[in-house]
């Protein structure tokens, strides 16, 4: 069974700032894609697979006056896999430990609607 078959939600393309770390988010990265149960992250710092981590996901929300507001959604997760590339950023696959209601609402607002 592939990783894609194990996912409860399909991933959406999502490139925004993230911060992550073992005890607190101290390393910078960029998301590649996102779902309520996980994400891929590109960073100069890759953490060890099977590590428990904390991730701050920076999301842009549109306020009533049509201006952008930056909010942080904090999730706990586990590094499932990591790929290290010479002279290039590393990539990590993260599985979130628990469904986060705020993240689910954000995800549902971003998924393309069928006509």
Language-model regions, residue ranges each:
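Short, charged beta-turn/beta-strand-edge "cap" motif at the junction between a beta-strand
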Residues: 58-63
